[in-house]
């Protein structure tokens, strides 16, 4: 595999800009955008392996469960019969058509796979070493992350992490007590703890792999054209006028600064205005709580002024 055809992995915590980053990096015809193979609810036509947990951890010891499926995915081998058997709604049918065409076009045009998958974040070393992925990790301010989850009322069941012995052993054992103690209804507390764990692990990964690209969502939002141009250059992608236009349209001040909770995956927003939304949504006591809970990790990415 030549360097230019290495797959790209865009990951980071969910609700941290991975969709926007992935879509913008796949804005031209060089790449094929594939969404969340490690989502527990992934489509069987796209990825054949069963995913048991949110934030499934993959390493050398359990790779036999996933490696063949990922090789098929990166070969753009679409399992049409599996997908047909799983169709239960018109939405499923339309999604099958979309995914089939992504795989077909990738094969016909020799495209490079771009995997957008927040749930791969703990497994980044495996993706880099076994699948030769170029890595992009997005970060979003912890208060913005918590505010987004609270607004959507998306809680997180830490049993998905606690029930993974390899993940606990390798990265998260020191957080066992905090995960066990968090209340099921405490979305803010869950978000702060999850953010601290994810980006504490990411920081260790980055220290060992300085070539990986770790980007703040806020930096992309403040200067999208230039920041994405830099990412394109680092990944060996062509930053064409068409790409620039798509990025400008996705982040324009003419777009809304706030979206309906029903538009959870929209990528057209006023990017500059949207980074400030958490300051309007969260009361001061919740901001202070998030800051305290993420202390020790948040300072690695955000200065004190970023909390004001």
Spans of model-derived segments:
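A conserved segment at the C-terminal end of the G1
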Residues: 19-31
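PAPS-dependent sulfation machinery
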Residues: 34-115, 158-184, 271
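Conserved phosphate-donor/acceptor-positioning beta-strand/loop module used by diverse small-molecule
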Residues: 116-117, 130-151
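Hydrophobic/aromatic beta-strand patches that form the interior of the parallel beta-sheet core
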Residues: 8, 32, 134-137, 213-215
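Short catalytic/ligand-binding loop motif for oxyanion handling, primarily in non-cytosolic enzymes
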Residues: 22, 40-43, 121-124, 143-148, ...
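Short His-Asn-centered micro-motif
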Residues: 11-12, 115-118, 139-140, 217
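PAPS-dependent sulfotransferases, especially Golgi type II membrane carbohydrate sulfotransferases
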Residues: 1-9, 14, 152, 159, ...
């Amino acid at each position: 595999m030549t360097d230019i055809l290495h797959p790209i992995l865009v990951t980071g915590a969910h609700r941290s800009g991975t969709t926007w980053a992935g879509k913008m990096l796949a804005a031209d015809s060089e790449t094929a955008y594939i969404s969340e193979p490690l989502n527990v609810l992934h489509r069987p036509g796209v990825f054949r392996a069963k995913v048991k947990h949110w934030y499934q951890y993959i390493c050398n010891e359990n790779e036999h469960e996933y490696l063949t499926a990922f090789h098929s995915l990166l070969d753009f081998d679409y399992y049409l019969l599996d997908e047909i058997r799983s169709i239960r709604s018109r939405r499923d049918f339309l999604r099958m058509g979309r995914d089939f065409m992504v795989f077909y076009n990738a094969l016909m045009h020799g495209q490079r796979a771009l995997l957008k998958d927040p749930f791969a974040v703990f497994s980044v070393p495996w993706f880099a070493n076994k699948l030769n992925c170029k890595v992009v990790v997005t970060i979003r301010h912890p208060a913005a992350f918590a505010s987004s989850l609270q607004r959507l009322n998306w809680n997180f069941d830490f049993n998905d992490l606690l029930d993974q012995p390899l993940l606990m052993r390798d990265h998260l054992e020191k957080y066992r007590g905090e995960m066990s103690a968090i209340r099921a209804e405490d979305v803010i507390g869950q978000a702060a703890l999850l953010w601290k764990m994810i980006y504490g692990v990411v920081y260790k990964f980055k220290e060992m792999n300085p070539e990986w690209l770790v980007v703040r969502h806020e930096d992309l939002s403040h200067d999208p054209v230039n920041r994405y141009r830099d990412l394109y250059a680092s990944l060996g992608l062509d930053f064409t006028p068409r790409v620039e236009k798509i990025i400008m349209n996705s982040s324009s001040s003419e777009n809304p600064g706030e979206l309906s909770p029903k538009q959870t995956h929209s990528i057209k927003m006023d990017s500059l205005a949207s980074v400030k939304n958490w300051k309007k949504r969260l009361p001061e006591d919740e901001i202070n709580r998030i800051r305290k809970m993420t202390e020790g990790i948040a300072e690695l990415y955000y200065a004190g002024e970023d909390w004001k």
